[in-house]
Amino acid sequence: MIKRLRFGLFVVAVLSLTLCLPSTGMSAAPSGEPIVIGYVGMVLSPGTRPCMAIQKVAVDEINAAGGVLGRPLKYVIADNKGATSLSVEGARRLLMEEKAKFIFVEGRTEICLAAQENAAAMFKDYPHIMIFNGPMGRELTDRVLDEYEKYKFCFRDWDPEPSHYAQQRYFWGETWKDRFPKGLTKMAILWEDLEWTKPWRDGMPDLNLPPWEEMVEKDYGVKVVYSKAVKPRGTMYLPILQQIAGTGAQQIFYVSSWFTDTESFAKQWADSAARDIPVDLYGGVSQTSDFWKLTGGKCLGMVGSFTECRIPLTEKTIPFVEMATKHQIPTQIHVHLAYADVYFIKKVIETAGGTDNVDKLIKAMETVETTYSLGKMAYETKKIKPYFHSKVRVDPADPQHTTYPGVFIQPIGQFHNGGKIQYLGGSCKENEPIFKGVGKPSDFVMPAELRKRDKK
């Protein structure tokens, strides 16, 4: 009983995510039975909450424009408080009590796996589509091919770990040459100590993919002089940075995510003996200008994806960023995806002719394509693990070297003085024409030089 009360039902008018949207010119008001979209995630997470907020905006926009096939969308949140058990319970309640047809699960592989298994057990009685919002764990889509009939309703709106080899080869083999014209021979790597980084730490022999450390040393001549797995939150970084400074590393690569306390890392880095060693952040809250404010400007010189970009990557990029900024929603990569997901679902329902036939919905999920703010939203249909039912990015036949052009356009930027972003290009050769005139790798400036400029 206590658990039921605590977990409640989170129609929370979607939880105070009603964002006080301004009234808009309405089309004919949608009517009939609502199509329920649910989200299972941690409401207080700085990574997950923006996804919920932006999806609520998308739902309100669609309803204001007449709904989907004349029916309204209803958005419901189940707060898992960061716990796996509450994630399973939340998804169950969304299915049984809210009759959800589409359920999103926050992007932690461990949580997604548990929710997926429970959803598979309930699928016969409660047919639905489950979408994993941002996790990389290959297991999630490996099993879709292994047991298609059991897991055919599961999709991942991000790409699995093997899809990121082409990106790293491009960075290490191409763009870093321009950033470090005098040469780079030593680097340090910090790994977020969670399951999703293990395939890169250990390699994936079944896919003939080496560990990243082996790859960068063997293929690009850069010796990894320091490597450590660290807790995603609460790590005392100063001793680690002191050790890195003593290794002679010329670069720090932090394989971080939206759960990593990169703001704490940035503050400690700026005051450490390693402050002159450039830092690349793999992911996290550094993807928007909020990071400059969160760190009090101590992220000066750091590099990473920057997706609060007013660059016309597609026709939807600038309108999306301006809309999200208006609602004070940070535009990290997974937030772009979360918004795009709702409009993708709209097209899926229209293509399937409604929500009554889940097999038609699954077929539409597999075949529909839409344009969104960072490229194309579509799912891989080649039956190769773990790409099948994951968002398209690389060619599964050549994941180390070939990226599909235009499907995921990833701006790379460096924080310069005053919080200005200097773009350094993209994350693959196939998309570099998009960044012509915007920025290039040689526009990189060493952190020590940027600090000198601050003093002038």
PLM regions with names:
Residues 25-39, 67-72, 176-186:
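Immediate post-signal peptide segment of exported/extracytoplasmic ligand-binding proteins
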Residues 29-34, 46-56, 65-147, 157, ...:
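Beta-alpha junction/loop-to-helix N-cap segments that form part of ligand/metal-binding clefts
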Residues 1-36, 64, 445-456:
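Short, low-complexity disordered leader/linker segments with a strong preference
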Residues 100-227, 277-303:
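Extracytoplasmic ligand/sensor domains, especially the bilobed periplasmic-binding protein
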Residues 48-56, 84, 197-213, 314, ...:
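Short, surface-exposed alpha-helical segments at coil->helix boundaries
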Residues 137, 141, 151-162, 268-341, ...:
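Extracellular/periplasmic periplasmic-binding protein-like sensory domains
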Residues 56-67, 92-100, 116-124, 173-177, ...:
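Sec-exported extracytoplasmic/periplasmic mature domains
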Residues 326-335, 346-430, 453-456:
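Segments of small-molecule ligand-sensing domains
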